[in-house]
Amino acid sequence: LEGADGAGTTTQAELIRSSLAAGGIDAQVTAQPSKGPIGTLLRSVLRGKITRDDGRRIGGRAIAALFAADRSEHIESLIEPLLSEGVHVICDRYYHSSFAYQGLEVGLDYAAAVNAPMKTPDLILFVDVDVDVALQRRDSRATEQELYEVEAIQSRLREAYHTAFRLR
């Protein structure tokens, strides 16, 4: 599932998992950034808790590479083992999110290049909602704001998702 912050991907992923379970189909929801060591590091970078030595935020290319590294580790440590056991995997965000989010800063070509080796999903669902609705949902959550969760980026982000899906 792909979509901007506040689009409802997490809610939809759980609804899909529940529906599959009701039909006797084994499925697990997972998310990116992952809860693994690289994903944890990445969340600290996105929240501004880890910065460059001079206090400035980590650059866009490094962030894109961290997302790709987290995704690669997530595939190897969790997604592939689940799939080999016959479990359906519902991923709350995958590489199209990098095309949209990191593509805004470093360009779609770079974001696509660092994600080129990733396993291709069988199905991609894009949850597209109005920017104001997404902002309202996001603002109602009691979570720390991350780098890409600023209002000025949200309409550009929605268009970036649309562009990523047209081109890929």
PLM feature spans:
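Hydrophobic positions on the alpha1 helix immediately C-terminal to the Walker A/P-loop
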Residues: Q12
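Conserved lysine of the Walker
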Residues: T9
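Hydrophobic alpha-helical packing residues
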Residues: I16, L20-A21
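A structural motif corresponding to the C-terminal end of an alpha-helix
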Residues: T163-R168
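A glycine- and Lys/Arg-enriched "phosphate-lid" helix/loop adjacent to the NTP-binding pocket
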Residues: S97-A160
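The conserved Walker
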Residues: D5
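ATP-dependent small-molecule kinase phosphotransfer cores
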Residues: I25-A116
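Hydrophobic anchor at the beta1->P-loop junction of P-loop NTPases
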Residues: L1
